[in-house]
């Protein structure tokens, strides 16, 4: 009874208040989380912490707005009534390109450094968004699917530098014991990007015109590229600070750097890295099956103006922030910086949520259930892709480790795009929410397999030769 009452109350509010509420909620959640962040003292000076903030904030904001230049496709789809088949095809080829690109871009980031590759990501993705915007100015027809798929795939190639870059840069700036909290920060950045991508893009499409969802993100990305060039540095020493040993998998490794093939072999023969990669395959499947398809479900079934769909980006942002911080704090302070237990618990939430969605498709509760599921899956992604990759790859090999793990995330994304474009209802059949029963049925097996795999790394912990922090 509570959900319908809240929906009716929201519908009766004046427009200005409906616009203000999401912003206030978002600011409140961010303030709550920031003030509650645990302090892990590993001996960093105040000057070091200040310079580190100036380092990760620009690169983090760049990563967030890369999300806006990635998930804006959903807003464009809904604005121009693109078919599920065309949307799934474009999304699938973008995801495949993103996943496979890590085979090249992971080692390349280890070689070039995260500062250079975040610039490549921002400038390249910005240029491809401009190209998609120019194509969109000519109007959408289904025969443009191939061209959009090609441009979106090129966009996703440049996008793939983003995650590797942010983890590569921060691997040298964060001690192992600080990284659970950093995993929470990683979740915040992902979540802010989702807010921009879904809520801002929808408002841009409705308030200006659909092609502008591809023109606004490049403007922001190009400005942030300038900030990255000015402030971001790969290591503390490059920024005039003292380097330190983060006590990760690279600790004590002072020999010459391994070649790309040797590093890849080391990563691919690590049972822990392979299990984490497999878990993240299902994370990619579930994350995008929820985030991308719930707005499509809401529009098709006529509920797009109710509270959850109308504020989807804000709710994803809040869920992601809380999920990321909760996962990071529990990992560091309950499980001794082990990532597997938290991933297992969150996957359990995903499995339970799939069952609840199956029995609530026709009611207002389904939106809130998928918000909670988003909290769980963003928490897993930040914990494993953003944190475990640093732990087990080490700062010297983190590019390859992230490449393997995030590559699997986007292969999972491609699998969901290929699966859901065929099994979900389209056209008039999509108007009946009960015809969407295939949606939770597709989610449940992925959640179960991810849970079983996550339990395999319950006790996994990175090891290296300890050294004193500065």
Show where each model-derived region lies.
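Cytoplasmic membrane-interface "Motif A"-like loop-to-helix N-cap segments
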Residues: 111-122, 332-347
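Extracytoplasmic gate region of multi-pass secondary transporters
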Residues: 70-75, 270-325, 381, 413-420
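C-terminal ends and interior cores of transmembrane alpha-helices
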Residues: 123-141, 348-362
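Helix-loop-helix hairpin linking two adjacent transmembrane segments in secondary transporters
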Residues: 9-18, 186-237
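Hydrophobic core of transmembrane alpha-helices in multi-pass small-molecule transporters
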Residues: 64, 128, 143-161, 365-383, ...
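Cytoplasmic helix-loop-helix junction between adjacent transmembrane helices
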Residues: 151-190
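C-terminal transmembrane helical hairpin of 12-TM major facilitator-type secondary transporters
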Residues: 337-387
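Juxtamembrane intracellular "pre-TM" segments in multi-pass secondary transporters
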Residues: 42-49, 239-275
């Amino acid at each position: 009874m509570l959900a319908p009452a809240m929906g009716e109350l929201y519908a009766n509010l004046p427009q200005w208040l409906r616009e203000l509420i999401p912003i206030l909620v978002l600011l409140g959640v961010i303030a709550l989380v920031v003030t509650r962040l645990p302090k892990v003292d590993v001996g960093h000076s105040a000057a070091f912490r200040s310079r580190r903030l100036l380092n990760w904030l620009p690169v983090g904001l760049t990563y967030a707005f890369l999300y806006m230049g990635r998930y804006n496709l959903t807003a464009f789809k809904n604005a121009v009534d693109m078919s599920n088949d065309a949307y799934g095809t474009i999304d699938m080829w973008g995801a495949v390109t993103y996943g496979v690109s890590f085979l090249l871009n992971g080692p390349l980031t280890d070689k070039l450094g995260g500062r250079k590759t975040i610039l490549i990501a921002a400038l390249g993705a910005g240029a491809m968004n401009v190209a998609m915007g120019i194509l969109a100015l000519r109007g959408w027809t289904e025969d443009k699917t191939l061209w959009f798929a090609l441009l979106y795939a090129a966009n996703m190639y440049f996008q793939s530098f983003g995650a590797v870059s942010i983890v590569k840069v921060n691997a040298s700036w964060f001690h192992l014991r600080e990284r659970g909290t950093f995993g929470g920060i990683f979740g915040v950045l992902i979540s802010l990007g989702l807010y921009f991508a879904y809520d801002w893009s929808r408002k841009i499409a409705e308030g200006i015109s659909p092609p502008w969802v591809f023109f606004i993100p490049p403007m922001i990305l190009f400005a942030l590229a300038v900030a990255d060039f000015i402030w971001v540095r790969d290591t503390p020493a490059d920024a005039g600070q003292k380097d330190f040993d983060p006590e990760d998998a690279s600790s004590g490794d002072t020999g010459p750097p391994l070649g790309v093939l040797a590093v890849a072999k080391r990563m691919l023969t690590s049972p822990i890295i392979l299990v984490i990669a497999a878990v993240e395959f299902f994370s990619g499947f579930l994350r995008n099956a929820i985030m991308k398809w719930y707005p499509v479900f809401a529009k098709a079934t006529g509920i797009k103006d109710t509270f959850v769909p109308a504020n989807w980006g804000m709710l994803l942002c809040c869920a992601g922030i809380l999920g990321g911080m909760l996962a990071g704090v529990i990992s560091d302070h309950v499980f001794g910086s082990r990532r597997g237990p938290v991933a297992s618990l969150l996957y359990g939430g995903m499995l339970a949520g799939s069952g609840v969605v199956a029995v609530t498709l026709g009611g207002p509760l389904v939106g809130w259930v998928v918000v909670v599921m988003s909290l769980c899956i963003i928490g897993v992604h930040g914990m494993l892709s953003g944190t475990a990759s640093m732990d087990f790859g080490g700062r010297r090999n983190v590019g390859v480790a992230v490449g393997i793990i995030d590559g699997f995330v986007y292969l999972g994304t491609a699998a969901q795009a290929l699966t859901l474009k065929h099994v979900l209802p389209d056209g008039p059949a999509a108007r009946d929410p009960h015809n969407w029963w295939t949606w939770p049925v597709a989610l449940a097996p992925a959640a179960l397999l991810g849970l079983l795999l996550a339990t395999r790394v319950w006790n996994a912990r990175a090891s290296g030769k300890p050294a004193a922090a500065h």
